């Protein structure tokens, strides 16, 4: 079907099959090579007259995909590179009507065996084997001018192609529409050659132009998409491949495209973003060119399809429509024309660019209108003042509606308050200082629940009480921070001041107060308005004044010289004045205490020790408290206090001398870390010992104490004492037990005590004379003794001297002053080597009686004796602490609590009873009972000898109406190494007793015999002044069980848990000679600690306060040792 001399390819497959043509596979006409020799290598610019006859001169189909020349010559033509050349099927589809019928032409083109000819050489003149792949230079010379919609098939399936990349390049190469039209199908192809040559010439002239790069970019774009299909940089990479592949072709002409492409991609990855920007810009322009070109092509196709007629020869029918569609490029868009037309396009784009940014600058009319309105409104507000005022009023009303301004009535009320000078001056007193401190110090950790609880408790306080409490807290804080001698004392962040809340029946019950760094909480109620405590430190007095500084009997209470204690007591009953305490010593802090209107004593405990004394109309209750670590005290409902043993660090001895009408000698110093707990209530004498959340055991003092007078020490240690006096019935405190009956006369039995050599003698210089004719009265009708602290026998001790408490305690209540001119004497006899150790003697004193105490260094293992407190007529100890360093008349009870302390818990609403909880460690003081029964007759008319305690165990004695509580009363005696010392409770005169006391003694007698075997553990007497038992964190105290009778309750003795175990099972032991607090008819039930047993090297002294976990006990502790086994041990 070819023209003259034209022959088909050697393979009969080279044919085009139009889908609409009558001939299914018409032969593709090719001109003979002789007619146009340079037509055979279609990829080379000069010889392409024949290729344009079949394909347009711009068609790079075979050139780009197949570097070798196509076999288009006749049979046996010199251009045949090999008979086994590969075949490429090219499908050309055209759609159209009758003029341009839809056609699908398949071109089966063979490929030579990778041979190429030099440009301009005839088909037969092969230069030899060329690179199997098209190099960059070759590709450059055959850039197509147009892309056509011709699809190729078959290259991937070419088996003879040794390198697969050749087949892979076929789909990548963009096919271009290059049909020459009906003119080139005549056979000779001359017109087509003449048409295509100018375009080739133009293309060669602009080979280095951007248009050439654009064509290469079109080719490389598909290649780049294959390697970077997911990358948005495909267009830029295509631009990058143009110069890179060209350079690689020049450096290594033998490098194939597939070898060079990975290198180019790698180079692209190492290119910086800045360098890539050039290629991004180039790709952007190329994309614009492509879009414009596609638009032009579409226009040309539409125009050409309308103006061209189909080819007349039947065999060329399919070519006619094709030509009408795609072969117009050489004629209408020659390369030169394309370059000419592209220039105006660029200028046109440049001309269009300026308007493009102008479009966004156009402001919408709505925005312009809004802007104008805003400007007019702004100008109008400034010009029209009236309008502005109206708007401001509207804004103000709106703000008020939003709640920005409070109610005008509230504003006026605030202004009125601020105008009052008192309101402004008391702001600090009303606002909680600790709360402010917490707010200003974000570093401190504050428990909000504790603060809320404290604030709720404060709701029950009156304004005067609240102001007093705040002032005291502020002064304490200043005192704790200002003095340099306080040895780094700091206030704890726990709730400050002593607070109280009201229970159901309106009575106040104290709750935990301020705690110092080394002190304990002082419980009590703040004194009435107008009272201010005055604390004197270093000679400087700080406000703590009371408008009424008179005692009820009209006598003022001067401050002792050593203490500079200046209590200003209120004249009215139950309204004691605040008590100021001065500490002159080695950096110990004495904190002022506040007195409550109803007799409660409260004070904030600063670091160090604080004396809390409540002076009711007749009573001067004193409370000592030793604390170690400031901790939050468990809720103390009814004046509960924990007694921590006095800290023996430095063996600082402390003597408290309080006199009414006379100066007390002796240096009153509180041991470091100890602080008296606020205890007494209105009209009631009571001492409460509280541990400041530290371990209840005291610091062990010197094991090898050197004998020296107490005066040599910087301060004298004061054992906890209790002064009970005046009306207990008037107690506004909600004690668990109220004292219904008290001993009319209290007499201290002469007790024989031994103390070890090498220990300092205790006592005060001179005899302690209590006001003659005075009897101590804890309640309205009777007086009782509440022993506190370690062992009960706490009289001033001295080597070979006996300390006397000469003055009888005065009973302030008229009906109970039956026993006047009575004295308490404690006689010390025996060998000096046996030192009465760890004795804690509660001192009862009122009004004019003086009291002092000194602390001696006691070895923990020394034998001690128990002092039995009883009533004795005008007995005195002539030599009272001659060696003690306390100046002035002072009685020196001892409390050397070295380790865990025993707990005395009192709890009842009817009668005050003693609740004893014995600590696991025994006391050092030993009482002796020759009879081995360890009991005292109820009336104490005849003295009883107490068997020596094996483990220095002691019992606290509680005075009953006719019986003075004895050491044996609370605990059975244990044999000890020596029995040289025997405590003989004796009563010379006993006044009539209350009927409840008789019943109590009867009950005690019944239970004494059954439980005397278990009385060995008597080293704890703990006084609790709360209606709810305070359970220590480690060892909870069991609640008291109501015993019926007259409403009194039995203070069940609770066993503190051992070092590792929970609290031991208590078992009560009744004692005939023991009364709780001379109060309720119910006898005190003591449950000795089961852990105590014979053979224990040391017994820990008793202390008032919640049982705390002791330091590692140095004795064996069998929590459940029966009395029989203990008895057998004693027999051994």
Curated annotation (Swiss-Prot):
Compositional bias (Polar residues): 487-497, 697-706, 883-892, 950-971
Residues at the site labelled Breakpoint for translocation to form BRD4-NUTM1 and BRD3-NUTM1 fusion proteins: 5-6
Summary of the function given for this chain in its UniProt record: Plays a role in the regulation of proliferation. Regulates TERT expression by modulating SP1 binding to TERT promoter binding sites.
Gene name in the database record: NUTM1
Highest taxon above the source species: Eukaryota
Phosphoserine: modified positions: 1026, 1029, 1031
Biased composition (Basic and acidic residues): 932-942
A Pfam family that the UniProt record links to this protein: NUT
GO cellular component: cytoplasm; nucleus
Localisation per UniProt entry: Cytoplasm; Nucleus
Compositionally biased spans, kind Basic residues: 337-352, 1123-1132
Record-given protein name: NUT family member 1
InterPro entries: NUT, NUT_N
Chain residue ranges for the region called Disordered: 1-56, 337-365, 383-405, 476-584, 693-714, 873-892, 922-1017, 1031-1132
